[in-house]
Amino acid sequence: MEKMENIKNNKINEIKDIENLRLTSGKIINKNVHQIGIIALGSYLENHGTVLPIDTDIKIASYIALNVAIQTGAKFLGCVLPSTEYEYVKHGIHNTPNEVVEYIDFLVEQGKKIGINKFLIINCHGGNTLINELIEELPYKSDIKLKIKNITSTHASTEELSVGYVIGIADKSKLKEHNPKDYPEIAMIGLTEARKNNKYIDNEAKIAEKKGITINEDLGNKILKNAINECILEVELLLNNK
């Protein structure tokens, strides 16, 4: 009983300590934005043809997440290291959905210790959508609010190359070698099992086959601007308990 009382008192003191901080300082949209944490989710180990690095997804997610944190004042909590993928998408090195959720759970628990009770996960890897149902089953859903914003595009195709170019991770000099005949993961054109099992993947592959793959800086800027603005809106909704 005494131990429980001490824990309760420590929690009260922690809250008071946070309240003593200058929560209105700096460029923020609202002092309550300090209760919101931004987490980047992507993938670290996937081939992306010749133009983009193997950790493209997490770098794009981190870029968006950090910019949202800077523009709103929300806290950037870092990256989820594991990622997952559909069984029929045979490329990259991934983890189980449960391992991804366990890492998110760790970040949430640590975030709660610094006064965060609302979390926005910005995901830039399609395979990670497998965690959606598991997230809903987390036991602390009554204590916190957690939202996932999925921002994905055709794998290693024009949109992703263009975004990668804008943030500085694409090597444009390698575009001529960026060929799906040599690198089947590009637009998943050569991933037969994935195309057979997922009509959306197959449709995206067909579009890339028809239109070709290039780098468009204007397109990259537009995609990034829209993604950041959409995530800022999510932060504003969290501020309004929506």
From Swiss-Prot:
Presence of the UniProt keyword Transmembrane in the record: no
Reactions the enzyme catalyzes: 2-amino-5-formylamino-6-(5-phospho-D-ribosylamino)pyrimidin-4(3H)-one + H2O = 2,5-diamino-6-(1-D-ribosylamino)pyrimidin-4(3H)-one 5'-phosphate + formate + H(+)
GO biological process per UniProt: F420-0 metabolic process; riboflavin biosynthetic process
Binding-site residues, Fe cation 2: H48, D57
Record text on cofactor binding: Requires one Fe(2+) ion for activity.
Sample GO molecular function, one term: ferrous iron binding
Keywords of the record: Hydrolase, Iron, Metal-binding, Zinc
Top-tier EC class: hydrolase
Pathway: Cofactor biosynthesis; coenzyme F420 biosynthesis; Cofactor biosynthesis; riboflavin biosynthesis
Keyword Cell wall biogenesis/degradation attributed: no
Cystine connections: none
EC identifiers of the protein: 3.5.1.102
SUPFAM superfamilies: Creatininase
Domain of life: Archaea
Cofactor: Fe(2+); Zn(2+)
Binding site for Fe cation 1: E46, D57, H125
Function comment: Catalyzes the hydrolysis of the formamide of 2-amino-5-formylamino-6-ribosylamino-4(3H)-pyrimidinone 5'-monophosphate (FAPy) to form 2,5-diamino-6-ribosylamino-4(3H)-pyrimidinone 5'-phosphate (APy).
Subunit-structure text: Homodimer.
Family: Belongs to the creatininase superfamily. FAPy deformylase family.
Listed name of the protein: 2-amino-5-formylamino-6-ribosylaminopyrimidin-4(3H)-one 5'-monophosphate deformylase
Encoding gene per record: arfB
